[in-house]
Amino acid sequence: MNFDDPVFWRAGAISTVLVMSVVLIMLTIDSLAAISQGGSNVPFYTVINQHIDYKFDAKRGNDMPVIGGPEPLFGKTVDAAGAEALIDKGKLVIQSRACIDCHTFFGNGAYFAPDLTKAWLDPAWETWQAITGAATREEAMVKFLMDPVTNRIWTRTMPNLGITQQEAEATVAYLKWLSAVDTNGFPPNFGHMQSKP
């Protein structure tokens, strides 16, 4: 073995690249199984038709979403294609309004306003229901998104982004689906909804 021979170093570099490429492919395939819709951490879009809760799992040592029985969003059950279209539109609304300039999603974004990763599960929506006169959490969220200035409860005010009823409903669908994603306990110390008897 001659360490001065460039062939030795070239062969070493090529074999290292090949081995690491195989490792990268294996890790990518493993990750896709966890992060794809319907994977181990990311539910199917139709989860918006179900009750979503957030409970501490002692075995894992963190909080995780718990998917329960039927609880259709806006009282209407949507099929897989309808749920995907609604969630895609909600994500587009969030991206087009640059919500990440003030909020965070999965820890990415600005920390000026609340993290929206588990926004659907936020116990504060019960207060917003009373303020907006809404009968349901989703109705309160829609009213808030359409007129955050009038419906504020804190000193900081979210600007009115001109969100329509349809856009607000799609955004709420996206936020409900997002709350069902298993984020391994992120965000930490997130509050819990009051369990219904």
Regions flagged by a language model, labelled:
Residues C99-C102:
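Short cysteine clusters
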Residues S31-N41:
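Perimembrane helix-loop junctions in membrane proteins
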Residues N189-P197:
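Post-kinase regulatory C-tail/linker adjacent to protein kinase catalytic domains
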Residues E84-A85, S96, F106-G185, P197:
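Extracytoplasmic electron-transfer domains, predominantly the class I c-type cytochrome c fold
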Residues M1-I14:
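N-terminal positive-inside, membrane-proximal cytosolic segments immediately preceding the first
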Residues Y54-Q95, A134:
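Electrostatic cytochrome c docking/interface patches
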Residues A13-D30:
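Hydrophobic membrane-insertion alpha-helices, especially the h-region
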Residues N41-G61:
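Short extracytoplasmic/periplasmic juxtamembrane "stem" segments immediately C-terminal to an N-terminal membrane anchor
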